[in-house]
Design a protein with these regions (language model features):
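Membrane-lumen/periplasm interface segments of specific transmembrane helices
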Residues: 1-95, 192-197
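Hydrophobic/aromatic-rich transmembrane helices and adjacent perimembrane loops
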Residues: 20-32, 93-121, 151-171
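Signature aromatic-anchored transmembrane alpha helix within multi-pass, membrane-resident enzymes
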Residues: 52-67, 131-142, 172-197
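Membrane-interface alpha helices of multi-pass inner-membrane proteins
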Residues: 1, 139-147
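Flexible internal linker/loop segments at domain or repeat junctions
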Residues: 69-140
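Membrane-interface junctions at the ends of membrane-embedded or membrane-associated helices
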Residues: 37-50, 121-132, 167-184, 198
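Membrane helix-loop boundary segments at the extracytoplasmic
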Residues: 147-155, 192-198
């Protein structure tokens, strides 16, 4: 059979939930919504104030810290991402690739990865604020990540960007300067990808 044995396709395989994918999914989602923050009509300080006054964010951040403790104590990072005997010969998104490029030491890679998980959750919370529809949609992507193997950046490429724009288009103010920064962000990403795979 050509079906990936690690992908959950039947009810009796639910014990194979890939909980570690929640962190990697968050980095992929955050990567695509980060440049959209520059398009907000209101300044960043306004949204920062909303972020810190929203009690729901503290719940999400607390859950993310609990998740980090769970992953740190249960994930064999070397087996999962190490160059030798790894479950992943590809995938895991930009955070994994950047960690490989900048850190030879596996412990530093692991530290960088977990910090990236946490920062990504903060970015996502900052973006969605109190919007229930946004929360539900992004929750859908997190749930999907539990079933997929391998989890790859391509799964989130255009879908996340278009979804985020459609959800908050009324709160965006687009001009040439902001558009230039936006395209520069993804152009840098494209160049980096080309260099990585050369």
């Amino acid at each position: 059979s050509n079906v990936n044995q690690n992908t959950i396709t039947k009810i009796n395989r639910l014990n194979l939930f890939h909980l570690e994918h929640l962190g990697y999914a968050s980095t992929m989602i955050a990567f695509y919504i980060l440049p959209l923050l520059i398009f907000f009509k209101k300044n960043i300080s306004f949204h920062m104030k909303n972020f810190f006054t929203n009690k729901l964010n503290y719940l999400f951040i607390t859950l993310s810290v609990v998740y980090l403790f769970f992953v740190i104590n249960n994930l064999d990072f070397q087996y999962y991402t190490g160059e030798k005997h790894s479950r992943y010969n590809y995938g895991l998104g930009i955070t994994h690739k950047v960690s490989i490029l900048f850190f030879e030491n596996l412990l530093l890679r692991e530290f960088f990865t977990y910090i990236s998980f946490f920062i990504s959750w903060v970015i996502i919370c900052f973006y969605i604020e109190k919007k229930i529809m946004d929360i539900l949609i992004f929750t859908f992507f997190f749930i999907i990540s539990l079933f997929l193997f391998p989890i790859m950046q391509e799964y989130f490429d255009l879908v996340i960007t278009l979804t985020a724009i459609l959800l908050l288009q009324n709160q965006f103010e687009i001009n040439y300067k902001r558009a230039f920064i936006f395209y520069g962000y993804f152009a840098t990403y494209l160049i980096g990808c080309i260099m990585y795979y050369l």
